[in-house]
């Protein structure tokens, strides 16, 4: 099984291009099922979850063409949904990726029926699907859970309605939003997720002919239309990848510019990096972080839905706190079981104490390389970051987690001066 070996001690310097957002491209690919003509998606990242989604669309009968493109143009995917013949998303594909649940709303709205296996993916807590089910029921769907499958039917078109999410759910908002686009009448979604990826999905749907207002706010209003046509959409840059490279630069005392970025989607993260002592300069599509000659200061943070601090950056900031000056307190409010990286960081010499959903991190002068194991996507990134500043070699196992969400991370870090390689 492939591993990544990181030799610590090199400050990162240079420029890196940010890929398209994992958490935007997956729902957007699923949204192509709503159309009655081909849809082209560009700025698509090379990720395992994208491959899985393409397999799922193909399994449903869609014709999918991948254009690897060029370094400047990027990768694009053309989906022709006119050949869709199946409305069942099987366990074999869904079990490896939770985002597969996002075909539920589009299939139901377009074809009046859908069967989707209960999802798998990262092992970081329960992540219930009840918000998806309740939201679709509010649009008139009949839904049951039988033999591990969510089975949904509509009697004719879905009917517009009002739904208040019990809790903020990104994928729940996306699923119900996609279904509402083809529903009859007006749908109002309250307590909707405000993440930039939700807004990007809405922008894609609007480009195909949907009528949506309020995406990026807690209240989204959808005027249902009878059909969506074809079109093109470019996926927004990945704010979590952006944040990960900025933390890497801060931890190593380097200076890095990330390009093809969207600084306005990262306010909470940039505020914490500034608090840690970094000098940050932004343009419309780039961020430069300078930490040369400085040790980061410990920062305390609490994860919460956007625009607050993202749970997907929690593990990376824990790694930063491991070598920072002072004590940082991290409160995780989004997912349970999201401190699984703590035991691995302890193997590198970190000083971390966990009390329930809170981790207290005391910065150490240095970490020491050791064999460690990735437990989920963002945890794997935190172990690479820790390896960048640890003495000697850090060998990270189970890096298939990493390939679900980061495109060529070892090549990008290597180009910035890191000593990092993938081994068979």
Swiss-Prot record:
Binding site residues for phosphoenolpyruvate: 22-23
InterPro entries: Enolpyruvate_Tfrase_dom (IPR001986), Enolpyruvate_Tfrase_sf (IPR036968), MurA_subfamily (IPR050068), RNA3'P_cycl/enolpyr_Trfase_a/b (IPR013792), UDP_GlcNAc_COvinyl_MurA (IPR005750)
Gene3D superfamilies the record matches: Enolpyruvate transferase domain (3.65.10.10)
Active site per database record: 122
Binding site for UDP-N-acetyl-alpha-D-glucosamine: 98, 127-131, 312, 334
PTM-bearing positions, type 2-(S-cysteinyl)pyruvic acid O-phosphothioketal: 122
Any Pfam family matching the protein: EPSP_synthase
GO MF annotation terms: UDP-N-acetylglucosamine 1-carboxyvinyltransferase activity
UniProt-annotated location(s): Cytoplasm
Family to which this protein belongs: Belongs to the EPSP synthase family. MurA subfamily.
Job of this protein: Cell wall formation. Adds enolpyruvyl to UDP-N-acetylglucosamine.
Name listed for the protein in its UniProt record: UDP-N-acetylglucosamine 1-carboxyvinyltransferase
Organism: Xanthomonas euvesicatoria pv. vesicatoria (strain 85-10)
Gene name of this polypeptide: murA
